[in-house]
Amino acid sequence: TEAEKKMVEKVKTAFPHVAVVLNVGGMLDTSWFKEDEKISAVLLAWQGGIEGGLAAADILCGDVNPSGKLTDTFAGTLEDYPSSESFHESLDYVNYEEDVYVGYRYFESFPQAKEKVIYPFGYGLSYTTFEISVKDLKVEKDKVSVKAEVTNLGKRAGKEVVQVYYSAPQGKLGKPALELGAFEKSRLLAPGESQTM
């Protein structure tokens, strides 16, 4: 809201580093903070419930290393989402005009939409860095198996989420260009430690 933006502007004048915590339940316009050099960090807390404030504080103070990933795509403005035109027409029915291209599938399938992405589906930061390398890939009839090794290259312990995406052949009906096929989170990896998943 405009009131929240004004509050952030006041905070920015008082502090050299500003972290914005978003306690939201859906998409929002991200254009106002993406390119703002005075906003050092943005933490998406979603709706953490009664312990959400403590969890956010643990992350912001560095007591916990974040390992979450976005469950949706964040575009620059609300108008960048194809559902924004029809979403609030009815209180009890949503017409998904984008068909099978709901959410990240839309942004991955259409080049003009991909350009509007600020934070992609599956995006997330950590206080450490990881390397993910594919160790084995098997295709057996209708099943694909992937083994990946995650290595903590940083100086802090942390967890990483391995995400496997696929592209299905196009048929008579349109299909998204890319879909999430599987994901798995590693255990807590010490610096230099690896895990095969």
Name the predicted role of every residue range:
Residues 1-37:
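Hydrophobic helix-and-loop "lid/oligomerization" segment in the mid-to-C-terminal part
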Residues 2, 11, 97, 103, ...:
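Generic low-polarity alpha-helical segments
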Residues 9-19, 54-59, 77-82, 183-186:
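Low-complexity, flexible helical/coil segments
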Residues 23-159, 165, 191:
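Secreted, periplasmic, or luminal enzymes acting at the cell surface/secretory milieu
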Residues 35-38, 163-172, 178-181:
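Active/binding-pocket-proximal capping segment
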Residues 172-197:
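Intrinsically disordered, low-complexity Pro/Gly/Ser/Thr-rich segments with frequent PxxP/GP/PP motifs
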